[in-house]
């Protein structure tokens, strides 16, 4: 069984709901999902032992929230090169944060990224059936690529 870490932060609870639904999709695919708020991760050693990493942040002012920026500096020290990665987040006006995370994971961390790209979802859609199903599908697809 593969082990996937979903590390996220959320201000309104929407990105947290996305994280939970992505984890459901991973579990539906028969893999293990662990969800952690990035503020709970204190050192790079806590990022070891996973087969894939999915990082999530809402978008504010076309950017990541500050806690995600700090977390990415921590994650860079964890040597995640070659691991499977994905990124997600909620947004109101622009969905730039997941793309920034995805690009950082791919180009700075040298991770093997999901061929789905980053996944963003308008906040108004997060609570709906289709939005939650899309999150589950993202989780399942990451597992499909893990093998």
Residue ranges of model-derived segments:
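Glycine-rich NAD(P) Rossmann-fold beta1-alpha1 loop
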Residues: 12-16
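FMN-binding flavodoxin-like domain, especially the glycine-rich phosphate-binding loop
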Residues: 2-3, 17, 23-29, 34, ...
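Short beta-strand/turn micro-motifs composed of small residues
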Residues: 8-10, 89
